[in-house]
Amino acid sequence: MKRILLAFGLVTLAAISAACSSAAAPPGASGPVDPSGPTIVAKDMKFAGGPVEVKAGTNFTLHFDNQDSAPHNVAVYTDSSASSAVSIGEVVTSGKKDQVVAALKPGTYFFRCDVHHDMTGTIVAK
């Protein structure tokens, strides 16, 4: 009985560890994820900095740092019409949140806060 409980505990621990891993590829993507992706900062109701550059063809981790007390997210779209989403991050009231973005083809992409549509930026995949 002790062996069964020990085995069950180990399987449960392994499942929890796998579920919490930030290196998993997003749905519809395969391959490794670059954990050293860009950081996007929300401060004073805008995104800080200029265009964000990423390596084309590689899944990457987008590090979001919400320094406002207002809720924000980072939603990546193919263009400024925001009609075709590439990755939609979780809304964060304050603090940091990582999201994995599937590999982008070379080109320019649009991102915004889906809560505050006037908060926008550009991602360039090279």
Segments from the language model and where they lie:
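Extracytoplasmic copper-binding redox domains, predominantly the cupredoxin/blue-copper superfamily
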Residues: 2-9, 13-16, 20-126
